[in-house]
Each structure stands twice: as structure tokens, then as C-alpha cells.
């Protein structure tokens, strides 16, 4: 199995989501020792925002692309292929201002590609990436699950993956991290217990 591990937090070593995605990957490898892991840090090795230049590069014939366009297309294709080659994804998705980090959104903009990960038919859009498993580490300073302020976070992630045919999602949650030392420790401990004892339980 090929596992793609993505972090998107901008907090480096202070990041709760990074700590937990690492623990998820280690727990997965304990259960599936023959798996191959590919790691990508979307914060330190950030993709640019999807732009008019991105569209222009993709639409320009190969033989007349300039160097910048060649680099854009090659990078986007590598990102897409990395996703397509994966069987399992572990994604760190902290909440920033009620939604996912822009670095993670830029990654989605490279993998939601008509004809590659979804297609349009007379019946509407059809996802082409079924069969993949996604584990999302969801962290937030407040408590937004089930609230209007949470729609742009976990619900958005569910919608994005469902659009390309992926419905096998599991969430590891550590919320309320900004409510003080004790609530933070409790949330992290609960998430770690879930990872070690329930996430990959048979």
C-alpha cells in the first residue's frame, strides 16, 4: 500500500496536527508494515495559489510553453500523480479562520481535475477515485463541529473528497486547543488514545 502523508499547518514543531499525523502514520505502519510512505509538507513546500497563469500554462501547447509554464505544468502533474498513486492518505487539516489552510486548498486545486479525478456525464459529476482511504487529523482552537462555523472545515473536506469518489474518511479530532492547558492536554490525549486503540482496530 502507498500512503501519502500531508501536513499543512504553518506552526512547525508547535503544531498539534503535525504531531498527530505523525502518530497516525506510525500506528498505520505498525498495522501495515509493508506500506510505502511519501511525505509532503504543504506549508514549507507550498504550492502557489491556482491562478490565471496556471490555467494558461495547462492550455498552452507543449512546444510553445515558456520555462515558467513548463515548471507549472510539471509541478501540477507531479502533485496529481502523487495523489493518484496513493492508496491511503493521512492529512493534517487544522482550522484557520473557519476553514482549511490555503496551502491545503491549493493542493485540492491540483487534484480536482476534470477527466482525471472526476468527469461530467448526463447524470452529473462522477468521481473517479473510489477505493482510496483518507484519514484526516482535524484540529482547531475552538469547538466548531456541528456548528455553522464548522461547515468550511470538516464538511468542506467531506464534500471535496466525495466529489472525486472518496467516501472512506475517518477523522481524528483534537478541538478546543486554545481553551487552556488542561483542555488542550485532554483533547490531545483523547486523540492519541483513539489513534493507538481504535483507529486501526480490526
Curated annotation (Swiss-Prot):
Q: Which cofactor does it need?
A: FMN
Which residues hold FMN?
A: 9, 15-17, 95-98, 139-142
What EC number(s) does the entry state?
Answer: 1.6.5.-, 1.7.1.17
Q: Which reaction does it catalyse?
A: 2 a quinone + NADH + H(+) = 2 a 1,4-benzosemiquinone + NAD(+); N,N-dimethyl-1,4-phenylenediamine + anthranilate + 2 NAD(+) = 2-(4-dimethylaminophenyl)diazenylbenzoate + 2 NADH + 2 H(+)
Q: Which SUPFAM superfamilies match?
A: Flavoproteins (SSF52218)
What quaternary arrangement does the UniProt entry report? Homodimer.
Q: What is this protein called?
A: FMN-dependent NADH:quinone oxidoreductase
> Which species is this record about?
Pseudomonas syringae pv. syringae (strain B728a)
Amino acid at each position: 500500500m502507498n500512503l501519502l502523508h500531508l501536513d499543512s499547518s504553518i506552526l512547525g514543531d508547535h503544531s498539534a496536527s503535525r504531531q498527530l499525523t505523525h502518530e497516525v502514520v506510525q500506528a498505520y505502519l505498525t498495522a501495515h508494515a509493508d506500506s510505502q510512505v511519501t511525505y509532503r509538507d504543504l506549508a514549507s513546500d507550498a504550492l502557489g495559489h491556482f491562478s490565471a497563469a496556471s490555467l494558461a500554462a495547462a492550455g498552452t501547447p507543449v512546444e510553445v510553453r515558456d520555462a515558467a509554464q513548463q515548471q507549472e505544468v510539471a509541478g501540477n502533474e507531479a502533485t496529481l500523480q502523487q495523489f493518484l498513486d496513493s492508496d491511503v492518505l493521512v492529512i493534517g487539516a487544522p482550522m484557520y479562520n473557519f476553514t482549511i489552510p490555503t496551502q491545503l486548498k491549493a493542493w485540492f486545486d491540483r487534484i480536482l481535475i476534470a477527466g482525471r479525478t472526476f468527469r461530467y456525464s448526463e447524470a452529473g459529476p462522477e468521481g473517479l477515485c473510489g477505493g482510496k482511504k483518507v484519514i484526516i487529523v482535524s484540529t482547531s482552537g475552538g469547538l466548531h463541529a456541528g456548528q455553522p462555523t464548522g461547515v468550511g472545515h470538516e464538511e468542506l473536506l467531506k464534500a471535496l473528497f466525495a466529489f472525486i469518489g472518496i467516501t472512506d474518511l475517518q477523522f481524528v479530532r483534537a478541538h478546543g486547543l486554545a481553551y487552556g492547558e488542561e483542555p488542550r492536554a485532554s483533547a490531545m490525549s483523547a486523540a492519541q488514545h483513539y489513534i493507538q486503540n481504535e483507529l486501526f482496530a480490526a
